[in-house]
Amino acid sequence: MSQTSPLSEQADSSLKYDYSNVPAQALDAIRMRLAQLTHSLSKIRDDMSKADLPQWYSLQAQLSVTLTQLSSLTSTLQHFEDTLECTVPYPLPSFPTTAHEGLLTTLMRKKQIPEVENWIKDAIDHSGLDLEGRNWDEIESAIQRDKSTTARALDFINQEYSNYSFQGLYTAEELSKNVGDPQSMIYRSATSNAKPKAPFSVDSILTFMYQGTMKTEETSIAK
């Protein structure tokens, strides 16, 4: 087994590295988001690989959490985009290259893995942008126009969604104008003014059990 010479150990101990420019906040925030997303995806994979599949509501809740974590990771990456683009990782002399050779290779890798290359190529093909015939300003302007169109479409969908009750065949505006039969279960909405009937009282139930007659308000008044 090879041993480190005392001279090299003394040289390493005498070196003082400056960590002030290391983007620790950005890296730690991204690490936490990636750890949460990895844990959620692993749990979904384990649940789906079991013989008994999880209940639909449990799977829906897990997917909702995963989508939220993915959105949070995307926002974090966009927030620290400038910092990550100008950050260049490199190993220190004390880095355990033998034990973490795979991690070192990943950090020093300049080319994307095949899965990422296919994902980027698919996104470029669907965007319809000609990257070779345009400069970066034109591409950035096209991306901003696409984001603006997406935002307007989302606002329109939310506005149209608010115009419908999704509990019947009438819109929210028609229900507010008392159009249709509010008593019908088909057209009843959450804002219907129809009131449910009062439940039977204990006295009415006991009277019906022992006398066979239903005690109502009219009979009680007549008596």
Swiss-Prot record:
Species annotation: Eremothecium gossypii (strain ATCC 10895 / CBS 109.51 / FGSC 9923 / NRRL Y-1056) (Yeast)
Name of the molecule in the record: Mediator of RNA polymerase II transcription subunit 8
Residue intervals passing through the bilayer: none
A GO term, aspect molecular function: transcription corepressor activity
Its job: Component of the Mediator complex, a coactivator involved in the regulated transcription of nearly all RNA polymerase II-dependent genes. Mediator functions as a bridge to convey information from gene-specific regulatory proteins to the basal RNA polymerase II transcription machinery. Mediator is recruited to promoters by direct interactions with regulatory proteins and serves as a scaffold for the assembly of a functional preinitiation complex with RNA polymerase II and the general transcription factors.
Cellular location(s): Nucleus
InterPro entries: Mediatior_Med8_fun/met (IPR019364)
GO cellular component entries: core mediator complex; mediator complex
Keyword Repeat among UniProt keywords: no
Assigned protein family: Belongs to the Mediator complex subunit 8 family.
Gene Ontology biological process terms, A to Z: negative regulation of transcription by RNA polymerase II; positive regulation of transcription elongation by RNA polymerase II; positive regulation of transcription initiation by RNA polymerase II; regulation of transcription by RNA polymerase II; RNA polymerase II preinitiation complex assembly
Assembly information from the UniProt record: Component of the Mediator complex.
A Pfam match: Med8
Tagged with keyword Nucleus: yes
Keywords: Activator, Nucleus, Transcription, Transcription regulation
